[in-house]
Curated annotation (Swiss-Prot):
GO terms for molecular function: sucrose synthase activity. GO terms for biological process: sucrose metabolic process. Its EC number is 2.4.1.13. It catalyses: an NDP-alpha-D-glucose + D-fructose = a ribonucleoside 5'-diphosphate + sucrose + H(+). It comes from Oryza sativa subsp. japonica (Rice). Sucrose-cleaving enzyme that provides UDP-glucose and fructose for various metabolic pathways. This is Sucrose synthase 6. The keyword Repressor does not apply.
Length: 846
């Protein structure tokens, strides 16, 4: 597209002249838009109608390459209410403008997000979208963030901690007392940390820092803190500066720089050393959370693996930090999940379970309870979980305070349910909260906001989207795995961005839900467990005892319920893919690319790991379709002898060695998904040294630098993708070191950007920075917290009560399922007049 806009440009100002210049063609186009009555049109429909409206190819090309083509190509959707067409134009990630065009006279009017949403509502509910009805429930969280600094450039989205550091530096330039107060409040189990009450002014603190820095500079760098601890205390300095003279000197110098001339770099450096996080609580409530025999159970998958790896990394980082801070403290991490008495052979009925390969981390399971206090024995779908969450938060709070012997320093939620409970807990205890979505259901189901009534009986999206909004806006910081998760790409909004302005007609209109330019957004990409996924070249670590099993999986010639097909020519490299069998993962697409590309078939074999092999064994409609399609493609392209299809595998350890065995063949990993939010299998494959081809739609496009550390493929162009894979293997035949070069480059990319150690460092730095930010932003936060508390009490509670609960059966008495002490429900607050008017129709309050 030849035309672009600066952010200062307004589409509403520029569009009238553009319409005037192409008046004849655009009147025809807009007549086509409104000819079918009211409807919601997507970008491609708009472009198709434009194409049909202009007969002359030269005129059509000129239009598409001009300003109007830019606007329509940038439109995500348009609400057609004859004679008007309202456009939602996304000029860049996070940057939207709403305009309305009259189809007869082509007049243009700028719209607020709220006005656009009213038009959209009228498509499904005339009464709800009525312009003269101001009593409809409209929520505008952005109105409470006007004093909060925001990022301004799309390229800066996801770098919130950097902006917060800059803003804190600016505030401390004028007044350093808040930092002094923060340091004076630091303690652990009753012991003061870093400074004591002697240093009750900034001048005294700066003097003490100067004295201490000069003193430790004269010591041997390795001198233990205990040898000068008494001297520090005389100056008002307590433990926590470091374990040696050298580390103390660095921390003292960093704080001195912050106090003398605050700047973001020194601010971040200093807060990365502050001893403020010792205990962490992580909520992951739904499904069967455990360490064995749970993968493949309902609602149980990658989130469990993510959290267990996350915990190990966080504990390692905490132990290292505590040692470097010179403290004799023990970190504690609790993963809060649901205790399920009917555990189906898992350990989900065990209350407290140590996490393997950790020293101080445990899974704590707390049961769901009915209104009369009975333990709910059976599993509950993540879509039906909402009536139990408030009571769960209350019961969890009691257990957490008991086991940790105090408040946690950091609470992290996962998915909608975990994030909501984390919000309830942190609001009550006044501690720092981080949020991880994993998946936002609103983006999985097209138009699920305006069609929520059709889906609510099955998915209860009214509860889910409300809970998501509460958690996003309560949280101090939000952790995303990729930029695209937050703000998408040039063409497609991100998962969070789709919650900027949306409506659920008859329920609630979000004039501003969440703004991706909010500084709470940060990117911390997970890694793969490097004890499981390590390079194939590390021969001494290879799991050779698994090789007979893997040999059978890959090369045996018999078909059974574990694998079908065989590889006739074992000398050829293997291209390998492993994923669920559903349409979005596009495994059948890869098989079709392979079947259609003779050159690729001559160069390599294909191995697929995913799904079931027999459609009669699956209960998932989409998987059944994909299984049947796989069989059809194998027959259609006569792939027997060139393909091996292996049933989905859940043994991570064996899967790690399987990646390495594929690397032994000088093969490659292919991830062909139509869209992939992150791409953990891409990380796993690259960790094992496999050159990797991955979709350019989603997270893998950020993980891989194209043709440097791997290859991007377009899942919508199978010929181009398969040719790119074939070109690689052809080049490997001609250049004997090319395969090793790409393998090494992939590993280098992982070590620089995608390890759990890097992740843990980022998350704990966020906890420290946003923990201080809470104290600086306290007054501004308070108004929003009152708003959110009201919204929870008056909206979410009502919705949760409408979700049917399971038949209540008495649980078998077990020690771990004993009823906990019940915290009384908080009374509903009085609503201020401003909010009372906002909610009067929904709540009946006057």
């Amino acid at each position: 597209m030849a035309v672009g806009l600066r952010r200062s440009d307004s589409i509403a100002d520029m569009m009238p002249e553009a319409l005037r210049q192409s008046r004849y063609q655009m009147k025809r186009c807009f007549q086509r838009y409104v000819s079918q009555g009211k409807r919601l049109m997507k970008r491609q429909q708009l472009l198709d109608e434009l194409d049909k409206s202009v007969d002359d190819k030269a005129d059509k090309d000129q239009l598409l390459q001009g300003f109007l083509g830019y606007v329509i190509s940038s439109t995500q959707e348009a609400a057609v209410l004859p004679p008007f067409v309202a456009f939602a134009v996304r000029m860049n990630p996070g940057i939207w403008e709403f305009v309305k065009v009259h189809s007869a006279n082509l007049s243009v009017e700028q719209m607020t997000p709220s006005d656009y949403l009213k038009n959209k509502e009228a498509l499904v509910d005339d009464k709800w979208g009525a312009y003269d009805d101001d009593s409809q429930l409209e929520v505008d969280f952005g109105a409470l963030d006007l004093s909060t600094p925001h990022l301004t450039l799309p390229s800066s989205i996801g770098k919130g901690a950097h902006l917060v550091s800059r803003f804190m530096s600016s505030k401390l330039t004028d007044n350093k007392k808040p930092l002094l107060d923060y340091l004076l409040a630091l303690s652990h189990r009753g012991d003061k940390l870093m400074i004591n009450d002697i240093l009750d002014t900034v001048d005294k603190l700066q003097t003490a820092l100067l004295l201490a820095e000069v003193y430790v500079a004269g010591l041997h760098p390795d001198t233990n803190y205990s040898e000068f601890e008494q001297k520090f205390q005389e100056w008002g300095l307590e433990k926590g500066w470091g374990d040696t003279a050298e580390t103390c000197k660095e921390t003292l110098s960093s704080l001195s720089e912050v106090l003398q001339a605050p700047d973001p770099i020194n601010m971040e450096k200093f807060f990365s050393t502050v001893p403020c996080v010792f205990t962490v609580v992580i909520f992951s409530i739904h499904g069967y959370f455990g360490q064995e025999k749970v993968l493949g159970m309902p609602d149980t998958g990658g989130q469990v693996v993510y959290i267990l790896d996350q915990v190990r990394a966080l504990e390692d980082e905490l132990l290292q930090r505590i040692k470097q801070q010179g403290l004799n403290a023990t970190p504690k991490i609790l993963v809060l999940t649901r205790l399920i008495p009917e555990a189906k052979g898992t350990k989900c009925n065990v209350e407290l379970e140590p996490i393997e390969n950790t020293k101080h981390s445990n899974i704590l399971r707390v049961p769901f309870k009915t209104e009369d206090g009975k333990v709910l024995p059976q599993w509950v779908s993540r879509f039906d979980i909402y009536p139990y969450l408030e009571r769960y938060a209350q019961d969890s709070s009691v257990k957490i305070l008991e086991i940790l012997e105090g408040k946690p320093d950091l609470v992290i939620g996962n998915y909608t349910d975990g994030n909501l409970v984390a919000s309830l807990l942190t609001s009550k205890l006044g501690v720092t909260q981080g949020t991880i979505a994993h998946a936002l259901e609103k983006t999985k189901y097209e138009d699920s906001d305006i069609k929520w009534r059709e889906l609510d009986h099955k998915y209860h999206f009214s509860c889910q989207f409300t809970a998501d909004m509460i958690a996003m806006n309560t949280s101090d910081f939000i952790i995303a795995s990729t930029y695209q998760e937050i703000a998408g790409s040039k063409e497609k909004p991100g998962q969070y961005e789709s919650h900027y302005a949306f409506t659920m007609p008859g329920l609630c209109r979000y004039a501003t839900g969440i703004n991706v330019f909010d500084p709470k957004f940060n990117i911390a990409a997970p890694g793969a467990d490097q004890s499981v996924y390590f390079p194939f070249t590390q021969k001494q670590k290879r799991l050779t005892d698994l090789h007979p099993q893997i040999e059978e999986l890959l090369y045996s010639k018999e078909d059974n319920n574990e694998h079908i097909g065989h590889l006739a020519d074992r000398s050829k490299p293997i291209i390998f893919s492993m994923a669920r069998l559903d349409k979005i993962k596009n495994i059948t697409g890869l098989v079709e690319w392979y079947g259609q590309n003779k050159r690729l078939r001559d160069l390599v074999n294909l191995v697929i790991v995913g799904g079931l092999l027999d459609p009669s064994q699956s209960k998932d409609r989409e998987e059944i379709e994909e299984i049947n399609k796989m069989h059809s493609l194998i027959n259609k392209y006569q792939l027997v002898g060139q393909i091996r299809w292996i049933k989905g595998q859940t043994d991570r350890v064996r899967n790690g060695e399987l990646y390495r065995c594929i690397a032994d063949t000088k093969g490659a990993f292919v991830q062909p998904a139509l869209y992939e939010a992150f791409g953990l299998t891409v990380i796993e494959a690259m960790n094992c040294g496999l050159p990797t081809f991955a979709t350019n739609q989603g997270g893998p496009a950020e993980i891989i630098v194209d043709e440097v550390s791997g290859f991007h493929i377009n899942p919508l162009n199978g010929k181009e993708a398969s040719d790119k894979i074939a070109d690689f293997f052809q080049k490997c035949k001609e250049d004997l070191i090319y395969w090793s070069k790409m393998s090494t480059a992939g590993l280098q990319r992982i070590y620089e950007c995608y390890t759990w150690q890097i992740y843990a460092t980022k998350v704990l730095n966020m906890a420290s920075i946003y923990g201080f930010w809470r104290t600086l932003d306290k007054e501004e936060r308070q108004a929003k917290q009152h708003y959110l508390h009201m919204f929870y009490n008056l909206q979410f509670r009502k919705l949760a009560k409408n979700v049917p609960t399971l038949g209540e059966q008495p649980a078998q008495p077990t020690e771990s399922a004993e009823p906990n002490r019940i915290i009384p429900r908080p009374k509903e607050r009085q609503v201020c007049p401003f909010l009372r008017n906002l909610l009067k129709k929904e709540t009946g309050n006057n």
